[in-house]
A protein has these predicted regions:
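Histidine-centered active-site microenvironments of extracellular/periplasmic hydrolases
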Residues: 376-409
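Feature for exported/extracytoplasmic and membrane-associated proteins, marking the mature portion
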Residues: 1-352, 356-363, 383, 399, ...
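Metal-dependent active-site segment of extracytoplasmic phospho-/sulfohydrolases and closely related
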Residues: 360-386
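Active-site lining segments that contact anionic ligands and/or coordinate catalytic metals
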Residues: 323-325, 367-369, 375, 392-395, ...
Length: 482
């Protein structure tokens, strides 16, 4: 069933006229900008399937208690800065060294990290340790938004541009997801989707959002298709009285629709709504055809999202796609206090969900063709503010998949310090790897032509390399035939 073009024409007409609602109901620019559709640029789609899955950890994950120094010397520095949990003044947030023994990541013999540091994962992440040991997971050290390479001296002098509004949740979420300032209308996942549209029979299913609204999947042409753990999310803006997240816009639309059957807006809306229902039925029928044996457990919001992503990948043949970008998320990571315990539990959810998803890709025969990576607003201070940590900048993240050169570290390990040249105060890491370098490396694997990388990663020309090296060379992917 080909349904990738018709709804776009109706979407354009409907949203063009919904400019009336912007004046009457203050509909968001994000929603209205979905109208700007264009032809996809040339893309190296190859002959098989590939997908990228972004796991966004909202709130700013505390990387210091996610990937922890384990060797004696660096652990001692870490514990001295963070304080021992359970100390008399209750100011400690350092994890106990003995609790890390089962999650130590062995540094490859041909790698030497800064100060000979050895890392361990949080105790609640044993499954990611197993993936690292098997070569399916790689940590990317001290990555964050940068406009250009930046040293501490340049930061202090203000001689090199830096991202705007550092340490701010909304601004840095947008900057991470778009490689542009807060207010950007496209994200780098959506811009990859723009390039990949021509590879898919049904272009609507190129970018799929299994969580709330985010700029990451919005392109100039690509429009995020919304799903929930239960399947397709039907478009019915009047059901809850909030069109484009605006009650006034919803009321304005209701008034227009009641104005008579000859109203052109009403006709557009009716056609658009009918198409949305067709899409929902089509997606849900495709999902019902899927048999997935991998267990994702219960009571894990992230696992629920990744389960439906796995089901959609299993249905890729019926959906008519060979390239897809997905977004899932988990919130609750803004630990200004109560870090010990709460943070461990959240990391346990990430560990369980990402592992289950990887095992599902193995079951489906696409482990080499699906790459999952974590992201977050920012890292956090290495120093404790009592029983938590404050907003930072650079952080450590994970890349998972059969196409990953796992079992080794990428990027540059920072010193365990609050006054070294690779931090900007209180142990806030100054990134040594940019988000643009991360997105460019993923983009090359995904099929983005080198000449098109600046459209995905706008700052990449300022950095030494567009390929950090954590992905294996592109190979013929598994064909999307099932």
């Amino acid at each position: 069933m080909f349904i990738g073009k018709g709804i776009e024409i109706e979407r354009r007409a409907f949203l063009r006229r919904s400019g009336q609602l912007a004046m009457m109901g203050a509909a968001s620019s994000y929603a209205l900008d979905l109208a700007g559709l264009a032809e996809a640029a040339a893309f190296n789609g190859g002959g098989g399937y590939k997908a990228l899955v972004c796991v966004f950890l909202y709130g700013g994950n505390d990387h210091g208690n996610t990937l922890i120094p384990f060797d004696q010397a660096n652990y001692a520095r870490y514990a001295a800065i963070r304080g021992t949990a359970g100390s008399e003044d209750a100011s400690g947030i350092a994890l106990g060294r003995s609790a890390l023994a089962n999650t130590v990541l062995a540094t490859p013999s041909d790698q030497r990290l800064t100060d000979d540091i050895t890392y361990a994962l949080a105790p609640t992440m044993p499954r990611l340790k197993t993936l690292f040991d098997s070569g399916a997971m790689a940590p990317l050290l001290n990555v964050g938004p940068l406009i250009a390479p930046l040293t501490r001296a340049q930061y202090d002098a203000g001689s090199v541009p830096r991202p705007a509004k550092l340490f701010s949740h909304n601004d840095q979420q947008s900057t991470w997801q778009s490689s542009q300032p807060e207010g950007s209308r496209t994200g780098w996942g959506g811009r990859m989707g723009d390039l990949a549209l021509s590879s898919n029979t049904n272009a609507m299913f190129t970018a799929i959002n299994a969580t709330g609204n985010a700029v990451f999947l919005s392109g100039q042409t690509a429009v995020p298709y919304q799903v929930s753990p239960a399947g397709a999310t039907l478009y019915n803006p009047l059901q809850n009285g909030r069109l484009f997240n605006s009650a006034a816009a919803s009321q304005a639309l209701s008034t227009l629709l009641r104005s008579g059957s000859g109203n052109v807006m009403a006709a557009d809306y009716a056609r658009f709504n009918d198409r949305s229902i067709q899409y929902g039925a089509f997606v849900n029928d495709a999902l019902r055809s899927v048999t997935l044996c991998t267990s994702f457990g219960t009571g894990n919001r992230l696992a629920d999202q990744l389960r439906v992503v796995a089901q959609l990948i299993a249905a890729r043949g019926r959906l008519g796609v060979t390239r897809q970008v997905f977004l899932v998320s988990l919130g609750g990571f803004d630990h200004h206090d109560g870090l010990i315990g709460s943070h461990d539990a959240l990391l346990g959810q990430v560990d369980s969900a990402v592992d289950a998803f990887y095992r599902a890709t193995v079951e489906l025969g696409v482990a080499d063709n699906v790459t999952t990576f974590t992201a977050s607003d920012f890292g956090r201070t290495l120093s404790s503010n009592g029983d938590g940590s404050d907003h930072g900048w650079g952080a450590h993240h994970f890349i998972v998949g059969g196409g990953v050169r796992g079992g080794r570290f990428y990027g540059r390990a920072p010193q365990v310090s609050v006054n070294s040249a690779d931090q900007v105060g209180q142990g806030r890491l100054l990134p040594t790897t940019s988000v643009d370098e991360l997105s460019a490396t993923l983009g090359l694997w995904f099929g983005v032509a080198p000449s098109e990388l600046p459209s995905v990663a706008p700052n990449i020309g300022r950095f030494a390399s567009a390929d950090i090296g954590f992905m294996k060379p592109a190979q013929t992917a598994v064909a999307a035939t099932r």
